[in-house]
Amino acid sequence: GSIVMNEQDISRLDDTGRAAVRRSNLGIIFQQFNLIPSLDVAANIAFQARLAGMYDADSATGLAQALGLADHLHKFPEQLSGGQQQRVAIARALAAKPSLILADEPTGNLDEATAAEVMAQMLALVTKTGAALVMVTHSPRLAGQMGRQLHLRQGQLA
């Protein structure tokens, strides 16, 4: 088999080539945020984009503003609420302008009200950028906001 992303067969690439494709084409949002504790919000947002050679200060600032983080750019993750940390993780995932975003339970650690707010912001930004979003969630409410749903039951697509 093969894996084609943006018209490129990535299954034929070596490890270095696949890593380059991941850095420049994938944005990943983890349930546990996975922010770098020693970096402030601005540096956490910029991290992935810098690795991909795609850093744009204006774009990063725009993401921070769109996610309500403009007043928190010089704070460290431990100084932020869970919702703010997840917003940083979303901004980081979008900063390199990926074509595909993988989100693993992106609101799983948030209360219902914060989850709804963060999800609305994330979906608006994903729509604006034109990226595809693949999200794993146990929440029927969140799944209902997606254009297409696939259900996994006992390891099989149902």
Feature names for model-found ranges:
Residues 1-145, 149:
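ABC family nucleotide-binding domain
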